[in-house]
């Protein structure tokens, strides 16, 4: 546990906290809770995915951890406090070793680490001194929770009920602004994830052939990721033939047929930092003339969208650029007429038959990472770039996607060493010999 969390080093997490507390109002404290361990069936539980804000600020992944930041506290020892689970020999027998206080300090750089059982008393004394409280919540625009209150929401409800006369603020806006701009250490973690994704894709490209099942392709990715200390960044999409027209197809149980394409939206995560990749490759190792025609159109759209990425660009304007580029390609392919393009309403009804999603999203500790959607892009943002064309009547969906860093001078692909052009894909797949005759 400690080795994974400490990969960035305590100085990075200390820097993150310094930037966040600088934006708090005077006499304010902020509280961040880890995520719940969620049940499955019977006595089973899901693997804990740490609260990304807590990890960003501390590097600690362990369940039930709480961070309190109070930069204006009268006593210096109260300005940063990390609460971790109480030591339990019985728990160690069943679940293994948990963090000691010294290990939590080594990972996070926080000098004062306390047992969770002491939280209520210490927090009450801090609240007697504080005037404003920053509470955290998942404010991602597409977040949807049906299982009841999250740990953060339960804490917020209880805190407001017990201390109704305090002022309360939203921590999420500060966290989203800070997390959007990646530090050099964070970018290096994402580069490592991209490198592992590259190695896995190269392995898979030489493995795919007619008769292979989508689940076997998933297993090849899993072997490469897990063997090298990574994991899937998200549930993999391995979609052969018409399955590629379902945007988030995850059954991954169909057989790849000769002459079809298979869309691979699969990427690695390392030390909680994610990458995101999509390639669409020919099952038989060679594109048909029609497949190549459409593939190259998507590739040109990718290049145009990639070149448009730069500081100052706003997400909604980037989407407009993508829509205009893809509309032109669809007209050139004979799939739309100029009259259909011109007569569309604001909902882009004609375009949406073939391209119906955004052109990219922020990525980092979350795959669909936090960002302020109306904010201009800045150097240090890491985005995906993923135009596509889906043609249901031809049983074909082609999407191309890289993880891309925004710099002062424009976009830099962190996956530039992963083949994307149609000829490069065919060359990579042919390295195992002529198997398509």
Q: Which role fits each region the language model picked out?
A:
Residues 1-437:
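Active-site neighborhoods and metal-handling regions in enzymes and metal-associated proteins
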């Amino acid at each position: 546990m400690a080795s994974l969390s400490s990969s960035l080093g305590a100085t990075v997490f200390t820097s993150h906290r310094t930037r966040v507390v600088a934006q708090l109002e005077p006499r304010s404290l902020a509280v961040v809770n880890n995520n719940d361990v969620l049940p499955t069936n019977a006595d089973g539980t899901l693997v804990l995915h740490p609260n990304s804000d807590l990890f960003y600020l501390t590097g600690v992944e362990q369940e039930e951890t709480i961070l309190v930041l109070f930069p204006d506290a009268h006593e210096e020892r109260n300005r940063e406090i990390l609460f971790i689970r109480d030591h339990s020999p019985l728990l160690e027998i069943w679940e293994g070793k948990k963090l000691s206080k010294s290990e939590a300090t080594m990972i996070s750089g926080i000098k004062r680490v306390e047992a969770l059982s002491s939280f209520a008393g210490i927090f009450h004394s801090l609240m007697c001194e504080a005037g404003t409280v920053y509470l955290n919540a998942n404010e991602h625009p597409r977040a949807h929770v049906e299982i009841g209150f999250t740990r953060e929401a339960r804490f917020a409800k209880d805190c407001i009920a017990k201390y109704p006369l305090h002022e309360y603020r939203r921590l999420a806006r500060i966290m989203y602004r800070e997390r959007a701009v990646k530090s050099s250490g964070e970018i290096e973690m994402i580069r490592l994830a991209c490198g592992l994704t590259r190695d896995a894709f190269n392995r898979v490209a030489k493995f795919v052939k007619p008769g292979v099942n989508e689940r076997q392709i998933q297993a090849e990715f899993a072997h490469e990721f897990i063997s090298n200390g990574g994991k899937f960044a998200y549930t993999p999409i391995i979609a052969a033939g018409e399955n590629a027209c379902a945007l988030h197809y995850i059954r991954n149980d169909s057989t790849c047929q000769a002459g079809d394409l298979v869309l691979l939206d699969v990427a690695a995560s390392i030390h909680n930092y994610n990458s995101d990749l999509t390639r669409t490759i020919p099952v038989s190792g060679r594109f048909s003339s029609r497949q190549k025609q459409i593939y190259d159109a998507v590739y040109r759209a990718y290049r145009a969208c990639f070149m448009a990425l730069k500081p100052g660009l706003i997400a909604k304007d980037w989407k407009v650029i993508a829509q205009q580029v893809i509309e032109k390609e669809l007209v050139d392919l004979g799939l739309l007429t100029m009259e259909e393009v011109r007569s569309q309403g604001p909902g882009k009804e004609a375009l949406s038959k073939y391209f119906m999603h955004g052109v990219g999203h922020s990525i980092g500790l979350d795959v669909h990472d936090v960002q302020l959607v109306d904010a201009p892009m800045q150097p240090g943002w890491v985005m995906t770039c993923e135009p596509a064309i889906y043609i249901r009547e031809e049983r074909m969906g082609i999407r191309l996607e890289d993880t891309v860093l925004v710099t002062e001078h424009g976009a830099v692909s962190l996956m530039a060493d992963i083949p994307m052009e149609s000829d490069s894909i065919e060359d990579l797949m042919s390295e195992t010999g002529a198997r398509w005759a």
